[in-house]
Amino acid sequence: YAQMPGIVRGLLQEGTEVRKGLKIGDIDARAHSSYCHTISDKARAVGGAVLEAVSLYEKMAGRYAFVTLAAGLGTRFGGNKLETEIDGIPLYVRALRRMQIFGGFPSYLVAAPGCMEKEALDYGVVPVENREPERGISHSLKLGLERALKDNPDLKGVLFSVCDQPWIDPATIQQIFNTAALHPGSIVCAGCGDSRGNPVLWDRAYFLELTALEGDRGGKQIMEKYRDKVRVVQAGEKELRDIDVREDLPGAGRRKERRGDENYGSEA
């Protein structure tokens, strides 16, 4: 093996002598110079990617908000859906934990009065009361958007998620934020193949139309109107599933065929 002062090469090779105080080296300085260039290039590439990610985060932090809708009546589920546990974790806790991950973005939970207010604050999430859940998901969306803009008038966009979508990956959410920051004026949503679903991030260009929505319809009609502005972040099929009825719960014996994309999310 090649040995230099303080450096051992080929530590995993059979017969290598290892003595106390010796260090493990990755590069034999006597190796061909092209090897050094290759390793250096890789280091620069990794460093460049990290720098790019940090720069993008600095551009996004505080400029986008994260709103989770959780004021639905849960009529089809037949009970308190938000406290229903999956793998021992209630749906609302899963939602709060997801928002906590994105601490650089102001986060809001739209729910019924007195519902999860303390829990939301414990996770650094601002609770927003919906006293009229019977008005549908559009009313919750409007309340969340108005509160986010009241606290942050210069927002570039708002990401809307739903509380009953337990398997959405934070990495997918991060990619939605990244895509929105790189493509201003877009509507960015999660999707699987040709299907679209939640979460959806809306650029501020669409805020006025969002506040004009009525009833139990989400933003699908607006997305249809601006098809050329929609960008889809591909996610796993399971990520897009939501919990509408008890049969949608794991182990209930019914595989959900429909993804949560009729209204781009039914509110929990």
What are these regions (language model features)?
Residues G62, F66, L208, A212-A268:
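Conserved alpha/beta core of the MobA/IspD/sugar-nucleotide pyrophosphorylase nucleotidyltransferase superfamily
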Residues V93-G157, A171:
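Conserved N-terminal catalytic core of the sugar/cofactor nucleotidyltransferase
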Residues G62-G114:
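N-terminal glycine-rich phosphate-binding loop and ensuing alpha1 helix
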Residues F77-K81, I86-P90, A111, R131-H139, ...:
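Residues at secondary-structure transition points
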Residues L12, A70, A111-A112, V162, ...:
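Short beta-strand/turn micro-motifs composed of small residues
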Residues Y1-A61:
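Well-ordered secondary-structure scaffolds
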Residues E134-T211:
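Conserved beta-loop-beta/alpha segment of the NTase-like Rossmann-fold superfamily
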